[in-house]
Amino acid sequence: MDVHTRWKAARPGALLLSSPLLLFLLLLWAPPSSRAAQPADLLEMLDFHNLPSGVTKTTGFCATRRSSSEPDVAYRVSKDAQLSMPTKQLYPESGFPEDFSILTTVKAKKGSQAFLVSIYNEQGIQQLGLELGRSPVFLYEDHTGKPGPEEYPLFPGINLSDGKWHRIALSVYKKNVTLILDCKKKITKFLSRSDHPIIDTNGIVMFGSRILDDEIFEGDIQQLLFVSDNRAAYDYCEHYSPDCDTAVPDTPQSQDPNPDEYYPEGEGETYYYEYPYYEDPEDPGKEPAPTQKPVEAARETTEVPEEQTQPLPEAPTVPETSDTADKEDSLGIGDYDYVPPDDYYTPPPYEDFGYGEGVENPDQPTNPDSGAEVPTSTTVTSNTSNPAPGEGKDDLGGEFTEETIKNLEENYYDPYFDPDSDSSVSPSEIGPGMPANQDTIFEGIGGPRGEKGQKGEPAIIEPGMLIEGPPGPEGPAGLPGPPGTTGPTGQMGDPGERGPPGRPGLPGADGLPGPPGTMLMLPFRFGGGGDAGSKGPMVSAQESQAQAILQQARLALRGPAGPMGLTGRPGPMGPPGSGGLKGEPGDMGPQGPRGVQGPPGPTGKPGRRGRAGSDGARGMPGQTGPKGDRGFDGLAGLPGEKGHRGDPGPSGPPGIPGDDGERGDDGEVGPRGLPGEPGPRGLLGPKGPPGPPGPPGVTGMDGQPGPKGNVGPQGEPGPPGQQGNPGAQGLPGPQGAIGPPGEKGPLGKPGLPGMPGADGPPGHPGKEGPPGEKGGQGPPGPQGPIGYPGPRGVKGADGIRGLKGTKGEKGEDGFPGFKGDMGIKGDRGEIGPPGPRGEDGPEGPKGRGGPNGDPGPLGPTGEKGKLGVPGLPGYPGRQGPKGSIGFPGFPGANGEKGGRGTPGKPGPRGQRGPTGPRGERGPRGITGKPGPKGNSGGDGPAGPPGERGPNGPQGPTGFPGPKGPPGPPGKDGLPGHPGQRGETGFQGKTGPPGPPGVVGPQGPTGETGPMGERGHPGPPGPPGEQGLPGAAGKEGTKGDPGPAGLPGKDGPPGLRGFPGDRGLPGPVGALGLKGSEGPPGPPGPAGSPGERGPAGAAGPIGIPGRPGPQGPPGPAGEKGLPGEKGPQGPAGRDGLQGPVGLPGPAGPVGPPGEDGDKGEIGEPGQKGSKGDKGEQGPPGPTGPQGPIGQPGPSGADGEPGPRGQQGLFGQKGDEGSRGFPGPPGPVGLQGLPGPPGEKGETGDVGQMGPPGPPGPRGPSGAPGADGPQGPPGGIGNPGAVGEKGEPGEAGDPGLPGEGGPLGPKGERGEKGEAGPSGAAGPPGPKGPPGDDGPKGSPGPVGFPGDPGPPGEPGPAGQDGPPGDKGDDGEPGQTGSPGPTGEPGPSGPPGKRGPPGPAGPEGRQGEKGAKGEAGLEGPPGKTGPIGPQGAPGKPGPDGLRGIPGPVGEQGLPGSPGPDGPPGPMGPPGLPGLKGDSGPKGEKGHPGLIGLIGPPGEQGEKGDRGLPGPQGSSGPKGDQGITGPSGPLGPPGPPGLPGPPGPKGAKGSSGPTGPKGEAGHPGLPGPPGPPGEVIQPLPIQASRTRRNIDASQLLDDGAGESYVDYADGMEEIFGSLNSLKLEIEQMKRPLGTQQNPARTCKDLQLCHPDFPDGEYWVDPNQGCSRDSFKVYCNFTAGGSTCVFPDKKSEGARITSWPKENPGSWFSEFKRGKLLSYVDAEGNPVGVVQMTFLRLLSASAHQNVTYNCYQSVAWQDAATGSYDKAIRFLGSNDEEMSYDNNPYIRALVDGCATKKGYQKTVLEIDTPKVEQVPIVDIMFNDFGEASQKFGFEVGPACFLG
């Protein structure tokens, strides 16, 4: 029985409660229950009462108690115990409390020093712990890291590991921690934590040890509680663990919930304590917790000796129990209110406990006779037997018996109940409870208190010193523990006896043939099971590793579930097997494959600490994570279609100052400046008079294309044009001819394991059958894919006139017409109802930037993006060895456009240029601010007199209205005069590459260049552009029909390759394993037809085969007969860009166009002849710092410079060991363009070069003369839909409609678009002056208007004060008809009117922008027969055919085509180094190669200057998953996982008697074809780490049902894979996939490896956390890690703002030193810990560069007072005075003379000191002193 948690005993004074009146008074006084400081019982949460491994029961603190015949129960914990739980279980609802108590009754093993409990956060950092032993330590570290390890509270002079029982209470309150030992000694220590400390509850609680700590708690423990109240510690010996001689503690007590569970005979009455209940005195009104059990109070206080009637010392209130307490609670509520001492003895009130009708409300006294009676009892003072259940309920002289009450909360207590007991009280009346019919209390007299012992001799102990005492005597045997949790299912029992025959089976399902199974034999020993339920042997790490490998192999070898087989004969029903004995809990098995996510299970008990599982399968997608780090920039994508204009984004933060913008519009004329300096050479003057005609010039460059001419006649097809821009992705082309084989490439690296291959290649084609008869016309097929555009057809005959079309879109503006006469003013129409929202128009031209909008709300966190495309090349890596000089690079691409230069001084004003041609209409500008008030205009010309309107009634004079909003912008004015020519700007930065220019003329073919050297294989290029259609091949012979393939996905078009030379035939390779399925091969050449064999006899009907894989497209068939005309197909997609046609004849000169947008900067023209030297331009602004370029090619030798001054002495470099000569490095990176060399002398005139490539497009030539009028062109193709035209001119006014009824008041509509201007109204009153507007841009030049007749001047209005804007009024009554009003504002668009008459045919419009996709049109007319469609999906299986006659043996077939290549074999062992071949002739320079892999470590170069501070690189892409590493050491148990998947099906029982035959199932499909068995054994090995299930299906495709031998090939391949993998585990290669533990390990396996960078994984396990280090095999196999860039050191300086004697991390520019691997990634703490564990010594050098500053010894005084101090990784300070392992290799700084350096070496066997993390410098601060330092790598030697 479990007593480690609670005590219960009858309390004096409880007799008072037997009075119903008093109970009623207490009920009256009951306040609402407040929340308890409920203790968290760690022993219960860790399942101690089920005795996990390493835990046994023993006698507790008290061997006897006066109130009990049984000893206390405790638990003995051995070193085998591994107990942990999630911290969340301690405090599931809230965080860890700031102030709390830890209470424990414990007897530690004598002389031990171990942590009793440790709490870790989510990162694995210990945040709380209690270490028992001499000088116990309370470890506490909050979320800020306070206090540090040196400030942990230490309690010296106390020995908790003396082999005796101790009651220890720790109270943590604010910044103090108090230890109360054995209820007597009290010590308070300062706890330097932050004001609001946080202990993370997302980690784990470990009992008895720490992670990676050898010391494990051993001893006995009775109680371990966490209480969220710091005051609980002071009451520990009163409320939680009372003295043994306490007969009746002042606490309620109760019997153990179910003593029979542990003592079947009913013996053993044990008290256990109910936790006290602390109440917050400041919060009396909290709601009761849902799990309170109000009934319990009345019972708990009823067992009282009759003679004791003193008042209650502490009255219990209604408890609040957590789930953990519920399991042992009966009806007790003996929890304590923690109240101030004044209130401490006041009896607290009670709530209405709900005894049926007995207590209806607090205001009425309870009738003892009604409802369930209140149980009462007195203590029996003589040893009488318990009365039978049910007796003595009303008799105070008998003993009270309580009844078992069913639990209302989902049978939570059911395991504790006696199901046979009576229940006289219904559960609804009382609530959950427990039997207490065995409480018999014997009151004894306490013995005299023993005398105080003599004071012991003081111990002379230093902190941390351990003195082991003799072991104490063996304690008495513990009580039997409670039953354990249900163990795992035992092993399958023995087969039962033969059962009766089973029933007839159900009809069998349609069976599918399963592929033959595989058989796998592996030479590993597994833990064999013993008898049923016995525990298997432990498995060693190597075996478990092999098991993990085997598990992988099993998973890989296991194919997908085979199809359901035919129904077998039913076996006989066996009797149930004999039940196996309950086994011990087995070791945790490997994690199974992830099942479907189940519903959340109930909170499970915490499991025992298990081994670290292997990595689980990929989980279900989690919730959207936070936005990830920015990935590398991807490769530039293909240009997308122009998107819709986005909404204005939120206003961003102010950017960094941008480059100078483009020149703005001309400002207003400034004041006249001072006379400027003479300007630079002016522009050319005006054009002079034409000179005499010169001789005919040479043929000029092609001019710009002239204006569009009329369509010419159909020309002959031109020669193929140059390569156009990439078109849209085309459809797959037809099968091309097979090119000749390329040269044999170099052997590639072994690839990664491939994905499962597709289905295998199709079988050999069958013999060609006789041609069938022509079939009947089939139904029209489905819409085929859109074919390629055919060749341009001959012009067809004119069609019949079509139907009248619908009204066309509004045409573009025509030429301005002549001004018409003024029309009659129409009546004002009513505003029509708002029309439906029209479709979005085409995207308008890009407007000028609007003002920045307000910032929008932040959007929701987006999902983390998918992995991007491979990024651009990464940041430069660590400087590699100097490579050989690379080939000269190609000229780089044009740089980006430079920032605009500062404005130059104004040049002299140029003469006015000729009037430019009219540009295209510009985009509509933004509405400007109102301009400044203009001067009073002159009288305008009088307009023509209008018709006289009817006289209106005289209206009252209105008040001046408020200032109206700015009116809609007027129509664009007529074009103004062209502006003056602007000043020439400075040369801008080179712009970004412009868009591809117009295709130029075909250049002459250049001479064939010399053959280049073979380059390295390039990376896969982007999808190539669409190649030109190949020439039609000769018509092939009719091929055999291929199997129907599945439609393939569109692949990206590849670059068109050049045919390579035919390679020599390679040597014949060894016979490979059966390869995985290769890609579909090209169709082989047609074989010569064999002789026709005699007809065979009909074979049996085959089962339908599996659908074959997609075959390659067959050769083109013969042209079929034209089909019937089909329905009109949907409109095809835009065709590909056609070849550029021949230029048509010049058309007539068109009218000048409107001003065009400013064009993009054109590509540079051809190199002009050398110009005169220009005058010195003004200096440009300093450009931004560019990246440091690679050295350019050597410039020409300069003139010798003047002799420089004497330089400072350089530092002496380290003397490195002589390395092996490295092999020549790969070709280096292409260098950045070097700085321009000095101008060379003019070279000799070269010979005439070959014709150059076509130059870029030249400047626009002069317009050619008008050509003769060409003949009219044919009707062109309809143009694409043009952009939406400008609004047309207003049409004639329509007839007035009939007046409609007055509609209801509509909602306020959205602001409509500006309507057309109304006719001029009478002049309004003069408005207030407007704000000054910006100066408008000059309008385009207008055409002169007709002069109008002079108008009459209007009357001048008076200025009225602006009124406020009024609210909208309600609509008034309909008034009498007013005078004719002004035209109203334009209403919303009306309904579409009927189509008007067809207008005259407009001019040919220019091609518009691409329109939006239209609706799907009606079916078109049947087009011509398209190309052959992709094969359809396979149809359903046909019916089984009738067996044909057996055929005769056919003649041998012709040899089949070559089979697909087999899979790549495993990498062979490294071959011997071959002799170097003779030096070949120097080849031509090759193309620039790819960035090569890093070369081997070169000799140490001279120290470079310190580089500038680099920015931190972006987070790298996730690496590929490495192979599974060996099993690591067991980690701490993780949080409880989700429910596991359903277990595997058990083995089958013995065969039963035959049942009745089932109905025959449907026939299965045909099996796969047979296959020839390869000879065994197979020599080759395979490199794939696991075999894909899909490949197993393919490989097994030829296996029959009976012959299982074919699967052996796969098994032997797997065994070879495993053999290779185990070989690599024994002898790791130091690669990322196969890392070694340390460099020493690597050297032992491969003593011939050179020094260099290798991958290590000190903690083994999964290799994904391996890291790259530098292995110094020359130094015996050291493993070296490097300081990161910021920790490598600091350049020499005087450090004026820092203080001597402070750590470098406290400097303003300082930091703690951190270390990275050879790739710059930080090395994990765990990996460094393992690396230290595997090392015997470590060393590290630090170089101190000084100027008159001491680093180590001061030679002047001979002292080391100013020596540098180091802080080791274990936070230990190291210097000359306390560490003999530091020595100075060079101590040049000792003399304090000039620039020197001191090299200090730390070579220590205390590997935990290295690497150093901080440095203290002590000698600087004077004006003449400077220092810097360099930190070397930290190297560990095993």
UniProtKB/Swiss-Prot annotation:
Q: Does the keyword Plastid apply?
A: no
**Compositional bias per record (Basic and acidic residues), positions renumbered to this chain:** 837-846
Residue ranges occupied by any Fibrillar collagen NC1 domain in the UniProt entry: 1609-1837
Q: Which Pfam families match?
A: COLFI, Collagen, Laminin_G_2
Interrupted collagenous region as annotated region, ranges:
444-558
Q: Which residues carry this modification: 4-hydroxyproline?
A: 570, 576, 621, 639, 648, 654, 657, 675, 678, 690, 696, 705, 717, 720, 726, 732, 750, 756, 762, 765, 771, 780, 789, 816, 834, 870, 873, 876, 888, 891, 903, 906, 930, 945, 1017, 1020, 1023, 1029, 1221, 1224, 1467, 1470
Q: Where is the composition biased (Gly residues)?
A: 1294-1303
Which GO BP terms apply? Answer: blood vessel development; cell adhesion; collagen biosynthetic process; collagen fibril organization; eye morphogenesis; heart morphogenesis; integrin biosynthetic process; negative regulation of endodermal cell differentiation
- Coarsely, its chief localization is secreted
Tissue distribution: Widely expressed. Isoform 2 is more highly expressed in liver, kidney and lung.
Q: Name one GO molecular function term.
A: proteoglycan binding
UniProt keyword Signal present: yes
Q: Where is this region: Nonhelical region?
A: 231-443, 1571-1605
As stated in the Swiss-Prot or TrEMBL entry, residues carrying the post-translational modification 5-hydroxylysine are K627, K642, K708, K744, K774, K795, K804, K807, K810, K819, K846, K864, K882, K897
Q: Identify the stretch annotated as signal peptide in this record.
A: 1-36
- Modified-residue entries (Sulfotyrosine), positions: Y234, Y236, Y240, Y262, Y263, Y1601, Y1604
Could you list this entry's UniProt keywords, alphabetically sorted. Answer: Collagen, Extracellular matrix, Heparin-binding, Hydroxylation, Repeat, Secreted, Signal, Sulfation
Q: Where is the composition biased (Low complexity)?
A: 335-345, 374-387, 413-428, 460-469, 506-523, 559-570, 671-686, 722-741, 747-756, 908-917, 971-990, 999-1011, 1088-1104, 1259-1268, 1485-1494, 1542-1554
Its subcellular locations are: Secreted, Extracellular space, Extracellular matrix
3-hydroxyproline occurs at P680, P686
Indicate the family of this protein.
Belongs to the fibrillar collagen family.
Function per UniProt: Type V collagen is a member of group I collagen (fibrillar forming collagen). It is a minor connective tissue component of nearly ubiquitous distribution. Type V collagen binds to DNA, heparan sulfate, thrombospondin, heparin, and insulin. Transcriptionally activated by CEBPZ, which recognizes a CCAAT-like motif, CAAAT in the COL5A1 promoter.
Report the protein name in the record: Collagen alpha-1(V) chain
